[in-house]
Amino acid sequence: MYIDIIKNYTPTNELEAQDKKVMLAYIERHQDDILTRENEIAHLCVSGFILNKKLDKTLMIYHNLFDSWGWTGGHADGDSDLLAVALKEAREETGVQNVRPLSELPQSLDILPVWSHYKNGKPISAHLHLTVTYLLIADETEQLTIKEDENSGVEWIPVEALNQYCSEPALLPIYMKLVEAARKLLQFTA
């Protein structure tokens, strides 16, 4: 169950430990709608940080909403299988079908702000994404496809060039934390 996955997650730093604590407290009070967008203050989201097999490139999409290159992901929309959501979103948003988890367990927990915006002509108030992130591996030779209603680009970006592509500075430390986690996992499983 998704709550157990979050409870059993081992934070990598103090900020993650605090985010985990806040997430669990909020989930406890809002179990009836935390997996849906009906909770307009905060809801569970899932991201997939996709790397190539060498771990030197990451597959990013150009988010129309955030006007920046970033990871794949989306709302749980009632699905409590968070890894399945991460894989589904990765496939839908990039066109890559042969994507697999580097680990069955999440590698990051983050509370991220989403500023007010319009989606499909309707106003969306500012809110929080309680984000659970999985590390995914994909074949960089596979054909990429843009999902026009969400992104306007899909590209393999060298890890060392992320700061040149990502215009959301708060996400860069998270991305680098995930690259490091992937390298540790690959060392451990090799």
What feature does the model see in each segment?
Residues 10-47:
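Acidic, metal-coordinating catalytic segment for phosphate/diphosphate chemistry
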Residues 167-190:
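Charged phosphate-binding loop/patch that engages nucleotide di/tri-phosphates or the phosphate backbone
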Residues 1-12:
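N-terminal domain-onset segments
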Residues 77-173:
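Unchanged
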Residues 59-61, 74, 145-147:
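Short histidine-centered beta-strand/loop micro-motifs
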Residues 36-71:
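N-terminal strand-loop-strand
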Residues 68-74, 156-157:
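A short, polar/proline- and glycine-enriched secondary-structure boundary/capping micro-motif
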